[in-house]
């Protein structure tokens, strides 16, 4: 009798344990992300010829070069006030040249890639008694040079940047006299204060053109070549969970008079 009870309880408990505890498998898929270039140099193809008395051989090789560029910050304009007001056109010139050289080599050949950027900034100032207009023209040349076994390949990109800065009209000095009525003196004083205030503040028109006081402008533009490749990979992870129940841990009892 007791043996039957124990067998029944063991079967019920085994079914319950099998339904409650199962193997669990968790898998993670690898994730890869690669940044794409914003500018790529066209491939350079080289053909070598070798011939003997009966046969001519052609060997063609292609060299690929890719550059990554990041967006440069906006050009910083540093204003340095002049001691005296210019009365004629006062041009100034700023030139900045940056050169970046990268060397590629294999067992037989060495490739040298040179990236040169030149920025030419020209400023011209008109008479300060008028609304002087300062024009800055930047001619940018980006030359990529690849040298291979005595042959040189050059690719040049040219872009022109036009920067326009407007100067406000210089204030005219209005002198006040002690003679005359008080109303005219107050009116002249208000005009003087208003003119000085207009010459010192920055005005913005409806076309978002900025006005500022007469000064010498220095514009510096810099650029740097940056190569970035980002790869993130997660390895798959497999997890197994197994729980077993031992029959010796199952106990049972039956009351007298119970028949199973």
Curated annotation (Swiss-Prot):
Task: Return the GO cellular component terms, semicolon-separated.
Answer: cell periphery; fungal-type cell wall; fungal-type vacuole
Reply yes or no: does the keyword Signal apply: yes
- Glycosylation annotated at which residues? 23, 249, 256
> Keywords of this protein's UniProt record, alphabetized?
Glycoprotein, Signal
- Give the signal sequence positions: 1-19
Q: What does this protein do?
A: Required for vanadate resistance.
Q: What else is known?
A: Present with 688 molecules/cell in log phase SD medium.
Q: Can you name this protein?
A: Protein SVS1
């Amino acid at each position: 009798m007791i043996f039957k009870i124990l067998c029944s309880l063991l079967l019920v408990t085994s079914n319950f344990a099998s339904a409650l505890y199962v193997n669990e498998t968790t898998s993670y898929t690898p994730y890869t992300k690669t940044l794409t270039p914003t500018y790529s140099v066209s491939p350079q193809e080289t053909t070598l010829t070798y011939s003997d008395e009966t046969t001519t051989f052609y060997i063609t090789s292609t060299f690929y070069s890719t550059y990554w560029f990041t967006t440069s910050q906006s050009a910083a304009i540093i204003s340095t006030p002049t001691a005296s007001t210019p009365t004629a056109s006062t041009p100034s010139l700023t030139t900045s040249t940056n050169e970046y050289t990268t060397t590629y080599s294999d067992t037989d050949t060495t490739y040298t890639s040179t990236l040169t950027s030149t920025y030419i900034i020209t400023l011209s100032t008109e008479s300060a008694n008028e609304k002087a207009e300062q024009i800055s023209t930047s001619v940018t040349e980006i030359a990529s040079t690849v040298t291979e076994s005595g042959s040189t390949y050059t690719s040049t990109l040219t872009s022109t940047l036009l920067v326009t800065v407007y100067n406000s009209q210089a204030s005219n000095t209005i002198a006040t006299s002690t003679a005359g009525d008080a109303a005219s003196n107050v009116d002249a004083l208000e005009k003087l204060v208003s003119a000085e205030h207009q010459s010192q503040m920055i005005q913005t028109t409806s076309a978002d053109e900025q006005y500022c006081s007469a000064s010498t402008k220095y514009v510096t533009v810099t650029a740097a070549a940056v190569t970035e490749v980002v790869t993130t990979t997660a390895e798959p992870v497999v997890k197994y969970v197994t729980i077993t129940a031992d029959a010796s841990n199952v106990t049972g009892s039956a009351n007298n008079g119970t028949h199973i």
